[in-house]
């Protein structure tokens, strides 16, 4: 095929197009006139309806005037504003937004293929909001846990430093080695008279004269942690007892006996401190007092816990509530 073009000059210019074998053999497709429907899976069209930038379905489609590639309006405008002013697909130069034109026909085609797209996008937004909320809560709880650990370490270091400066402190007790190291969360009352005074024994158990919270031992990190609210028994404890509510966080593998031994040592040490004594022999003698651990049942009764029960077993058997487990203590009857 050739074409001659006459110009103002003396010689005509001619162009010749060489057709390939495919172009020579091809025939136009016949139009469908009998109502035949061809079923095409929407999944097979996904690559054609996908924005190359956000990899999601095209929304408010914009087409480049130069290379005819399609993008979401927000995606391509953001790319031109922050990128190299070129097509993200073929790298052809795009000067500005004037190199783009809206493509409402393509949007209409997408809405025809996916008539429930608004519902899909609303569902997608709800899922993303739920994921973001969950991640934010996880980040917050992780930050709080890390902060509490750092505070516990700082308290422990201050206690040891104070012990070194004073030249005195309680020694490690063999029975209390099963108890958790201290991480104090005290309910401190207002007023200068309630300032906390802290001491620390060699095992790292931090003590103060206010409400105490105990953290899990590092060697027990693999076990699940359980939070406890430890209160004196409302009827078996005498009114003049100086017992206080204690907040404890320890391993689920710890047993009721561990709590009883910890309580005996802790109360004995506080009693000696109130009397101005710090002799280890006096501490061993005073800590021989035994305590019984109780839990309140749904009927309002107090059940004595077996000393061999782990705290995890107690929680599964008696508590079954997603909040700190409430336990009660009182001196064992034969020691009263």
From Swiss-Prot:
Domain of life: Eukaryota
EC number(s) reported in the record: 2.3.2.27
InterPro entries, per the entry: RAWUL, RING1/RING2, RING2_RAWUL_dom, Znf_RING, Znf_RING/FYVE/PHD, Znf_RING_CS
Gene that produces this protein: Rnf2
Class of enzymatic activity (EC top level): transferase
Annotated stretches, region: Interaction with HIP2: 2-179
Tissue: Expressed in embryonic stem cells.
Example GO biological process: protein ubiquitination
Stretches for region Interaction with nucleosomes via an acidic patch on histone H2A and histone H2B: 93-98
Main location: nucleus
Known function: E3 ubiquitin-protein ligase that mediates monoubiquitination of 'Lys-119' of histone H2A (H2AK119Ub), thereby playing a central role in histone code and gene regulation. H2AK119Ub gives a specific tag for epigenetic transcriptional repression and participates in X chromosome inactivation of female mammals. May be involved in the initiation of both imprinted and random X inactivation.
Transcription recorded as keyword: yes
Chain ranges of zinc fingers (RING-type): 51-91
Subcellular location: Nucleus; Cytoplasm; Chromosome
Span list, region Disordered: 157-206
Record flagged with keyword Electron transport: no
Protein name (record): E3 ubiquitin-protein ligase RING2
Pfam families linked to this entry: RAWUL, zf-C3HC4_2
PANTHER family: E3 UBIQUITIN-PROTEIN LIGASE RING1 / RING 2 FAMILY MEMBER (PTHR46076), E3 UBIQUITIN-PROTEIN LIGASE RING2 (PTHR46076:SF4)
